[in-house]
Amino acid sequence: MEEEKVRVRLVFEDRRILSKYQKKQGLTRSWVVLNRKCHRTISEFSDHIFHTFSLCEACPHGLSLSMEGFVLPPFESSCVLKDKDIVCVKKKKESLLEIVGEDSDENVYNAIEVEERPQIRPGEMLLANEEFQKETGGYESESEEDELEEEAEEFVPEKKASKKRKTSSKNQSTKRKKCKLDTTEESPDERENTAVVSNVVKKKKKKKSLDVQSANNDEQNNDSTKPMTKSKRSSQQEESKEHNDLCQLSAETKKTPSRSARRKKAKRQWLREKTKLEKEELLQTQLVVAPSQKPVITIDHQATKEKHCETLENQQAEEVSDGFGDEVVPVEVRPGHIRFKPLAGTDEASLDSEPLVENVLWNGNMTKKKGQKWGTEKSGFSKRYAQDFNEDATTQPAEAETLANCPIDYEQLVAYTGSVKKGDVIAYRLIELTSSWTPEVSSFRVGKISYYDPDSKMVTLMPVQEFPIEKKTEEDDDFCMQPDTSLYKEDGSLEIEFSALLDVRSVKTSSSDSAEVAKSALPEPDQSAKKPKLSANKELQTPAKENGEVSPWEELSEALSAKKAALSQANNGWNKKGSSSGGSWSYKALRGSAMGPVMNYLRSQKEI
């Protein structure tokens, strides 16, 4: 008994049959199982391959199977195939003129003979030998026809080409020439093919009857159109090949990035390398400095600013040296002002040689005119007002200097009560761990409130330049081995809950009472604060009280009550005038009239 299922090896000789995906899977050489119950004949087996590999588009006319160079007929039984046989799969071609690139007369003649030859069916008798014997002069007729064919080939008219130009070996029936021809004319090659085919057919069918000749003429017309279609197909295939070549050339020449893109990429790489080098230098400097050599840790903002400016100048000098040489370097004279100076003179030049800029302040009511400086007016009153305002501005830094120079008695400071405001300067204490891991209350420290969250009640305190934060470091080995338990960050800021601060006192507030709070903290027992105050009724009040006799809290309360009374009197006076005139004063009216500068002057004097 033969096996019902046999393994067969398939080889696709023409790789254009399979798709790209199938080629990637390696199906050009594959195994297939042949079930002899289902596939009894070779045609059924070829249909099975046709459908399993989905070759409908690639092989519209079917497949032809062959083994060891011999074709397997479709009507043959599948028992011909044995286990592990190699079967070659080819594409079945059309019945007429499917040979690509062969347009000779012999191929055309052979194709027509194949069509005219009757199909041989099994069981029918062949009578070709008997008919050939009955005919007389069979060999002679064939020789005569061959001679006539040679004469026809010799008398084919040739095109005359000019001697100046070389004859091109390329086919002249290109797409460009077809586009130029508006009328539907046949090419010379097509005419030659049709003429040769018609002559051969006529000579071969001279001996037939008139009825048969009429039928043959119809077939002749059909045959003349077929070689035309063949030549068209060949030209289309040539055009498709040219198009594929152009696509391959365009794919090979890939677009390169532009010059600007390359420069930007190089600049980005340079910046990354520069930042990496800076980080490495900072780490090295931190590692070199030992922690035991730091007796007192102080946060100095001026030193950090100077270092930052130096690094900026060095970076700018490097950039300039890379591009234009060591000729000019930008130097920051003051905030927002940069001047270009030679590199040799930057170290020797000092900021004292630069002229001082006028401290110009804007009062909110002045506008700049042509040929006029910002913040100055041509009227005499504005000049006097600006002088008075500058005097007040100069007195405030003097008070700040006294605060910085003189030591503050934290016990005399007023307790910080009320709502926490941004910008207030407070003194506070903390509970810190000592070297023996025991809690201890620290000394008074001063910080400025930079951020406050009322929901979580978290406060961010920034250090003040006049009051640096000091941390005592012990020289014991045990203390050096312990980790850093400090609550402060690297920049000196402290982020803590407000309730965790102990004994909070106000050093300087953002309101107008800041100077009085600071003065109360200074140890000056025998000084009287005398300041004339101008009320709405133009009465001078000179309260003289000594700080030693009265507490600072009472002073603040009295000052607030006096200001409230002055404001209430001023409001009553304005309301009376407004009622008599029939309307109240608006902000626009104050700005448009001469009362605007007067009100600003009074506000600057802190009287209203």
From Swiss-Prot:
Residues 410-510 form the Tudor domain. This is Coilin. Changing E106K: In ncb-3; Smaller Cajal bodies. The lineage of its organism: Eukaryota, Viridiplantae, Streptophyta, Embryophyta, Tracheophyta. Residues 141-155 have a biased composition (Acidic residues). Residues 161-179, 256-269 have a biased composition (Basic residues). The keyword Phosphoprotein applies. Disulfide bonds: none annotated. Changing K20A: In NOD-RK1; Decreased RNA-binding. In NOD-RK1-2; Loss of RNA-binding. A motif (Nuclear localization signal 2) lies at residues 253-260. Disruption phenotype: No visible phenotype, but loss of Cajal bodies. Residues 558-585 have a biased composition (Low complexity). Belongs to the coilin family.
